[in-house]
Amino acid sequence: MRDYIVNTVLGNYKCVIFYDTSTICDVLVYTCVDPSRQSIYGYSPSYRQVEDIVLKLKPKIIIQLADECPQEHNEVHNLLGYITNLFLRCHRHESQLYTYTSKVEAIPLGYSNYIDLPLEIKPPQDRKYTWTWTGTLRPDRKQMIQEFWRMWNNATFAFTNLNKEELGTIYNNSVFVPCGRGNFSLDCYRQYEATIYGAIPVVMSSVSEFEATFKFFDELPPWIVADTWEQAVTLCQQVQFDYPKLLELQTNNLAWWHRMVSTMHSKITQALSLEVVQNLDILELNKSKVTPPQSVVYYPGDTKRDIDNRIFAC
């Protein structure tokens, strides 16, 4: 995630990274999950801690990571849009839109630190695998794999950890990439990683959930989407050997991604060009209207590890 923020979201700008909260900065990046426990995401500050830092450092841009679980009701963080020029968040929750100010924007989740950006994009006809699955095979993903067996020819699986080069090679040699749900929502890195490498993400979702999750900058990604995995596989089979159509799908996906990045850069450039105006009265007025955070979600794999307490800014 750090690579995505530094190399893509802020890729047009020179970044000097500080792992402290005492240095004046233009961009503040922090993780937003339930702060009452250590989690797989690492240290997460409370809303009050983040607000205090923002009031002190006056960053022009805030980038919020995590916050995948709307059940935790972290929407109070969206009010930080009243005291910064631009608040970018990596998940979009329909239930939180009532707290969005004009300065709050949901951006694509992006890619993990376990993958490099591709140097070239292979056209569909030059790809070795019809479809690919890499990752943990959770129970909800077994049905997905069972349905994709109908397209058995030239498939590949990897259930162990792959290095950056191996994962990139697999994506760049795959036509379709079935994308199961993330830990707590439809959104996950795999959809964007496949897109960036020119593979075609395949998602099972209702229209309403897909729109609620992925409507970034008022535009939906042009992935293959179906109500069931059976329907999704049928859609893939219909275009499996239609290489002009596959190339069109690939081109549309890549163009969508480049538009998302370009829009992010435009908004960031504008935000950096302005002085910060902190509307404290409006901030305080709206706090009482927001559902407070709740400790209701347990993340699989949570431990009490000693994790460095840090927020990074640049």
Regions from the PLM with identified roles:
Residues 1-225, 235, 239, 245-246, ...:
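Nucleotide-sugar donor-binding catalytic core of glycosyltransferases
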Residues 229:
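Short helix-start
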